[in-house]
Amino acid sequence: MKPLTPRQQQVFDLIKSKIEDCGMPPTRAEIARELGFRSANAAEEHLKALARKEAIEIIPGASRGIRILLEDAANEEQGLPLIGQVAAGEPILAQEHVEMHYQVDPGMFKPQADFLLRVNGESMKDIGIMDGDLLAVHKTQDVRDGQVVVARVDDDVTVKRLERKGSTVLLHAENEEFSPIHVDLESQHLSIEGLAVGIIRNTDWM
């Protein structure tokens, strides 16, 4: 990575701390507010400079589409974190949730996987996501209806197919024995933790 100016280092450090604390990068508006920029456009210019210096990657079309390339390089050496039991109110990628790391190339999944989540139950078995599988997940909140997502409803984390209907979200199982989960956004909290991008079934070789 090329040397950063003091201001660029501030932006870089803010992005890194937000990912560590919240599990996701900040928006342009959040960067501008925290660092005293006049507008989100000013933050965008600093992000472009960081991208030119290969410190970060900007993912088009996503409000939080920022990936730290140095972190990616470290993660590729360490492997993908396997997330176990997620504590209520804690970011899914908080260190205490990581059971271990698997030596898997994140780039084998498209988009690139950021973590693995062990599947519990058979609610998604009809599309080949089985109990005990390791689900590869791309960390993002930018998802479309019909995609399989990792969602947190209040304090419960689940893997389901997403459907939005006004102020209601339906999380569909892929098993006729399971009814959809109805989430009333006016009274319940829903957050999207990521997009399912693949599975690993036979882990004996890892």
Curated annotation (Swiss-Prot):
In chain numbering, where does the site feature Cleavage fall? 88-89
Q: What is the lineage of its organism?
A: Bacteria, Pseudomonadati, Pseudomonadota, Gammaproteobacteria, Vibrionales
Q: Name one GO molecular function term.
A: serine-type endopeptidase activity
Q: Any idea which UniProt keywords this protein has?
A: Autocatalytic cleavage, DNA damage, DNA repair, DNA replication, DNA-binding, Hydrolase, Repressor, SOS response, Transcription, Transcription regulation
Biological function: Represses a number of genes involved in the response to DNA damage (SOS response), including recA and lexA. In the presence of single-stranded DNA, RecA interacts with LexA causing an autocatalytic cleavage which disrupts the DNA-binding part of LexA, leading to derepression of the SOS regulon and eventually DNA repair.
User: Looking at the UniProt feature table, which residue ranges are given for the DNA-binding region?
Assistant: 28-48
Q: Provide the E.C. number(s) assigned to this enzyme.
A: 3.4.21.88
Q: How does it assemble?
A: Homodimer.
**InterPro entries from the xrefs?**
LexA (IPR006200), LexA-like (IPR039418), LexA/Signal_pep-like_sf (IPR036286), LexA_DNA-bd_dom (IPR006199), LexA_repressor (IPR050077), Peptidase_S24_LexA (IPR006197), Peptidase_S24_S26A/B/C (IPR015927), WH-like_DNA-bd_sf (IPR036388)
HAMAP family, alphabetized = LexA
| UniProt cross-references to Pfam families, sorted A to Z | LexA_DNA_bind, Peptidase_S24
Q: Which organism encodes this protein?
A: Vibrio atlanticus (strain LGP32)
Q: What is this protein called?
A: LexA repressor
**Homology family:** Belongs to the peptidase S24 family.
Q: What is one process in the GO biological process aspect for this record?
A: negative regulation of DNA-templated transcription
